[in-house]
Swiss-Prot record:
GO molecular function: RNA binding
Name of the featured protein: Transcription antitermination protein NusB
Function: Involved in transcription antitermination. Required for transcription of ribosomal RNA (rRNA) genes. Binds specifically to the boxA antiterminator sequence of the ribosomal RNA (rrn) operons.
Pfam families: NusB (PF01029)
Keyword rRNA processing listed: no
Organism the protein comes from: Xanthomonas euvesicatoria pv. vesicatoria (strain 85-10)
Family from the record: Belongs to the NusB family.
BP terms from Gene Ontology: DNA-templated transcription termination; transcription antitermination
Origin organism lineage: Bacteria, Pseudomonadati, Pseudomonadota, Gammaproteobacteria, Lysobacterales
Gene Ontology CC entries for this record: cytosol
InterPro entries xrefs: NusB-like_sf (IPR035926), NusB_fam (IPR011605), NusB_RsmB_TIM44 (IPR006027)
Amino acid sequence: MSKPGGHSRHGRRDGIDPVLRSRARRRALQAVYAWQISGGFAKQVIAQFAHEQAHEVADLAYFENLVEGVLSNRAELDTALTPYLDRSVEEVDAIERAVLRLAAYELLYRQDVPYRVVINEAIETAKRFGSEHGHTYVNGVLDRAAVEWRKVESGASGASGA
């Protein structure tokens, strides 16, 4: 529903609800993590989490896009992340690895999402689900990657500053 002036009830012209997007990212993280651990089939993981998500208000289409995007582009995402890591992708903690893959997908394939939003969401997700200092690692990797991947947006300065 729009308010006068063309803004949605969420205060954005594009109608995107940031809260629902955040929930979708958290659920996508859980789905990618489950896929990494179980080695399950992408469609099964998406179907399971989409069914569970039906009971939680979230952006289901965005959730599905994130999970399908990460799972179908895993090799490319890992290759893109490798120069910014201090170890192999597989040696990165499973939660931080899932966070990095999701953020890399958004930074590389979802140019409609500002890089600062991607990085800040990744940091908050890593704080919530990751190891004690995992968010610091995620921030460092994504700050460096965003400068290269989103040159026009990030300019020569650092990325998030967080």
